[in-house]
Structures are given as structure tokens and as C-alpha cells.
């Protein structure tokens, strides 16, 4: 359970059907910021909590701060690795099992000062919609961001329907 400005609570149902919970808040020292942007789990069961001022990981009950400065907007598991997108469009990766993130590409280097409005995986590319500079694709093979020539949408939104189709508008 999470709230955009009030941290997060992890609730676990144990084998004996009892429930336990842990609060994550800056005042408890287990979050870099209470303004939650996403919660995602990687293939190893590590929980990633992205905030407007940092990134934390939780694995087997242990919290680690990966970053305390960046404004994260979303995350995406791909293969064995976890990818992160900042509000300004920088793409970071955490290699499976690592405790650090590396910047792979910077949208601001090609698009200037813009912000991410949404994102989606389309044909094995991470498609990034920006508020004012159109649509870009991040290629997981060569770690490059390039303009998406097929889509010309500012401040786009994406919906995935129950048939698996992706609608961008």
C-alpha cells in the first residue's frame, strides 16, 4: 500500500495466515523521500521503491538506499536487469544482484529540458513520451535513446487493453 506523499507500507501474508506489515517513511530512516513514484519487484524478489528524491531497494527485509538525489518517475524489469527512468528522461540500469545504478542514456542530451509524461514497452523498445519534445525510444541492445519516427505525440498517454493491444494518444 502506498500514497504519493506519505511513504509506503509492505503487508505480508505468512504461511500460518497471519499478516505482518512494515512502514517505510523518511522519519523511520528506511526511505530517502516519502513522495513515492513507483514500487516494482525484480526477478530476484527485490522490491524497488522510487521516489522524487532517491531510490531504495528492499531485499529479505533489509533496506538499502541506492540513490538520494534523483527524481525517479518509473521502473521497468527487462531480462535479468532493472531499468529506471528519471523525470528528466535519464535511463539507469541496475545489473542483476548489484547494489548500484549506472546511467546508460540521457534524453536531456538530445531533447533538451523536457519531462517524461509516460512510457511503455513496444516491440522490445522502451518508448518514452515527453511533455513537449515528442516520443523517443530506448534500445535495450545498444543503450541509446533515439527519436521515434512513427509517433508524433506530445504529452502522450498509453493504455494497454485486455487484448494486449497498446493505445497511445
Predicted regions span which residues?
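Carboxylate-rich, polar loop motifs that coordinate divalent cations or form catalytic acidic clusters
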Residues: 1-169
Amino acid at each position: 500500500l502506498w500514497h504519493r506523499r506519505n511513504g509506503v507500507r509492505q503487508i505480508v501474508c505468512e504461511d500460518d495466515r497471519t499478516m505482518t506489515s512494515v512502514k517505510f517513511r523518511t522519519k523511520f530512516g528506511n526511505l530517502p523521500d516519502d513522495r513515492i513514484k513507483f514500487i516494482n519487484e525484480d526477478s530476484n524478489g527485490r522490491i524497488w521503491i522510487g521516489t522524487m528524491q532517491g531510490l531504495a531497494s528492499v531485499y529479505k527485509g533489509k533496506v538499502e538506499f541506492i540513490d538520494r538525489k534523483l527524481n525517479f518517475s518509473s521502473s521497468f524489469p527487462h531480462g535479468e536487469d532493472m531499468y529506471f527512468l528519471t523525470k528528466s528522461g535519464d535511463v539507469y540500469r541496475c545489473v542483476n544482484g548489484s547494489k548500484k545504478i549506472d546511467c546508460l542514456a540521457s534524453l536531456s542530451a538530445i531533447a533538451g529540458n523536457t519531462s517524461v509524461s509516460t512510457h511503455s514497452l513496444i516491440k522490445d523498445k522502451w518508448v518514452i513520451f515527453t511533455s513537449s519534445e515528442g516520443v523517443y525510444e530506448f534500445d535495450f541492445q545498444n543503450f541509446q535513446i533515439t527519436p521515434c519516427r512513427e509517433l508524433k505525440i506530445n504529452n502522450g498517454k498509453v493504455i494497454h487493453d485486455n487484448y494486449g493491444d497498446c493505445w497511445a494518444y
